[in-house]
Amino acid sequence: MKKFLSVFLLLTFTLLFSQEKKPMFWQDIQNFKKLNQENTPPKDAILLVGSSSFTKWTDVSDYFPNKTIINRGFGGSRLTDLNYFSEELLNPYQPKQIIIYCGENDFADNPKLKPKEVVNRYKVFYKKIREKFPNIQVDYISMKYSPSRENLWSQMRNANKKIKAFMDKEPNAEFIDITKAMEDTNGNVRKDLFLEDMLHITPEGYQVWTKIMEPYIK
């Protein structure tokens, strides 16, 4: 009877464990693993990590034709997600440069979030990068002013300033500010650079990003 009960409990536990809910973005990470299995990631590439502004930049290599780029952006991700999946996002690669775009969704997920908390989340991810890649170039692209998230801009701008101050003190690190480049002559954000959702940018928007990013690309 005891043996039967033990087997029953073991089977029950196994079933419950197998049905355990996967963490958010688990499938995205599995997709990255599959890509890496199908094609070994090249060494000394530029690794893009972050949220949908990278995910939707599917033709990023066309904007930087002489560079080898690995795009590992996954839409909706927050800095907390980059930290959670840091091993999967960093360990398979041997890049010469990492460029990060993330943080917007942290505020969108929790509008009451303080800029300092987002900055701390970024510092955690930066530290994880440096533990594995102490000497490579690491760059952070500023959170953009998205018309659909106008109510969050004050917090994002504050976080941008703090992240810039942090990056300015770090070796082999740069803060890439795309804010002014996306404004018109009156200092207003160019809505024509955005898709209908007023959140994601158009190919022309990516052209603007490219011009700002080019001096930083290794």
Which residues are covered by each model-predicted region?
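Charged helix-capping and loop-helix junction motifs
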Residues: 115-123, 155-160
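Sec-dependent signal peptide cleavage junction
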Residues: 17-32, 37-43
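Catalytic nucleophile-elbow at a beta strand-turn-alpha helix junction centered on a G-D-S/GDSL motif
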Residues: 44-59, 77
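Bacterial Sec-dependent N-terminal signal peptides
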Residues: 1-20
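Generic structural signal for well-ordered alpha-helices
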Residues: 86, 122-127, 160, 164
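Structural recognition of the beta-strand scaffold that forms the well-ordered cores
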Residues: 46-49, 70-73, 97-102, 137-142, ...
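Catalytic His-Asp segment of secreted/periplasmic serine-dependent ester chemistry enzymes
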Residues: 144-218
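Oxyanion-hole/transition-state-stabilizing segment in secreted/luminal serine hydrolases
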Residues: 54-63, 68-70, 81-119, 139, ...
